[in-house]
């Protein structure tokens, strides 16, 4: 009986040790990552941001992934028409995750030379497949903290992660938002970072959905990236909040 008791006790202690070790692991979504410097395209784009920042004169800074970068593609005309008076700069890179953006504004020094009045941040969709909602929210919080440390006077308009689908559908059909439950979890968590002072949360993802809660191809041709019409929805949704925050 004593042997059995000792064996059970050892197993329990081992299990507790494993659990504690797991809790001690750093959050990968909140750990700055510079491995994308090995990708020529990514490195060149990052370097272009550093060069742009060195010139200064940026009031509104957009930070994010390919959806943000798309302002230079499908959203180019909308950007030119909607943001012409904002002195805006687009620092979005396709494929970026929270940890990449975190490195860019810390080790990558992309903020050196600018003191934006406002940063518009939308990031996290590329983490959905490999991180928990809690980890992703932790990555977003790390970005907010790093940004505030570097630029304490910069206001932040934090956007909820946009809806998306992970399932291909027939041409011209609307797609069910398969990943929406997890995205809702993420958005529920990051919405709590709104402090009414320097961080302001805005979620307008529902504007991309039809009356069935599906993603129309006309707004998201691949059910992830926006069309020109999708970028118009984005521009319209942030126009008043941005104008208000620029006056703070």
Language-model segments: which ranges?
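Extracytoplasmic/secreted proteins, especially bacterial periplasmic and envelope-associated proteins
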Residues: 48, 62, 96, 100, ...
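Second-shell loop/turn segments in exported
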Residues: 88-93, 126-133, 176-177, 220-228
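Structural recognition of the beta-strand scaffold that forms the well-ordered cores
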Residues: 59-64, 87-92, 117-123, 127, ...
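Oxyanion-hole/transition-state-stabilizing segment in secreted/luminal serine hydrolases
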Residues: 69-84, 98-141, 146, 153, ...
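Sec-exported extracytoplasmic/periplasmic mature domains
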Residues: 106, 124, 141, 145-152, ...
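Short, glycine/acidic-enriched loop or turn micro-motifs at the edges of active sites
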Residues: 68, 95, 206
């Amino acid at each position: 009986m004593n042997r059995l008791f000792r064996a059970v006790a050892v197993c329990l202690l081992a299990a507790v040790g494993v659990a504690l070790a797991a809790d001690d692991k750093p959050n990968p979504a909140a750990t700055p990552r510079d491995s994308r410097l090995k990708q020529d395209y990514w490195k060149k784009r990052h370097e272009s941001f550093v060069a742009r920042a060195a010139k200064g004169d940026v009031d509104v800074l957009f930070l994010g992934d390919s959806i943000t970068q798309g302002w230079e593609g499908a959203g180019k005309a909308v950007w030119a028409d909607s943001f012409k008076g904002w002195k805006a700069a687009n620092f979005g890179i396709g494929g970026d995750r929270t940890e990449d953006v975190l490195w860019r504004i810390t080790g990558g020094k992309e903020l050196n030379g600018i003191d934006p009045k406002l940063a518009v941040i939308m990031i996290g969709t590329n983490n959905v497949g490999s991180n928990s909602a809690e980890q992703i929210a932790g990555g977003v919080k790390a970005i907010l903290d790093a940004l505030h440390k570097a630029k304490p006077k910069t206001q932040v308009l934090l956007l909820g992660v946009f809806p998306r689908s992970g399932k291909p559908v027939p041409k011209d059909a609307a797609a069910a938002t398969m990943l929406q439950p997890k995205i809702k979890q993420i958005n529920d968590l990051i919405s709590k970072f709104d402090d009414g002072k320097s961080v302001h949360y805005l979620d307008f993802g529902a504007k991309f959905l039809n009356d069935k809660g599906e993603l129309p191809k006309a707004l998201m041709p691949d059910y992830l990236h926006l069309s020109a019409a999708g970028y118009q929805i984005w521009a319209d949704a942030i126009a008043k909040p941005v104008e208000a925050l620029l006056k703070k």
